[in-house]
Curated annotation (Swiss-Prot):
Organism: Conus miles
Domain comment quoted from the record: The presence of a 'disulfide through disulfide knot' structurally defines this protein as a knottin.
Membrane spanning residue stretches: none
Species lineage: Eukaryota, Metazoa, Spiralia, Lophotrochozoa, Mollusca
S-S bonds: 44-58, 51-63, 57-72
Tissue: Expressed by the venom duct.
Entry annotated with the keyword Signal: yes
Subcellular location: Secreted
Protein name: Conotoxin MiEr95
GO MF assignments: ion channel inhibitor activity; toxin activity
Residues spanning the signal sequence: 1-19
Pfam family name, one: Conotoxin
Length: 75
């Protein structure tokens, strides 16, 4: 009986707290990550800077040696 009551109280508490935080980011890091993911403008890498799949070179440059940590070079 005591176990059942404790279980019911726990479930009520969890359901109330889960419903209260809906739509809110708990951590600032999550806010900045979601803002960054939604951003359509990204900084590009200049000539001689490192590039990857996510850090792209500026227009007119290409990423050479990308699989090993590439560099932006002229097209």
């Amino acid at each position: 009986m005591k176990l059942t009551c404790a279980l019911i109280v726990t479930l009520l508490f969890l359901s109330i707290t889960a419903g209260d935080s809906r739509g809110k980011h708990r951590y600032n890091a999550l806010k900045s990550m979601s803002r960054e993911a939604n951003s359509t403008e990204r900084e590009c890498r200049e000539k001689g800077q490192g590039c990857t799949n996510t850090a792209l070179c500026c227009p007119g440059l290409e990423c050479e040696g990308q699989s090993q940590g590439g560099l932006c070079v002229d097209n």
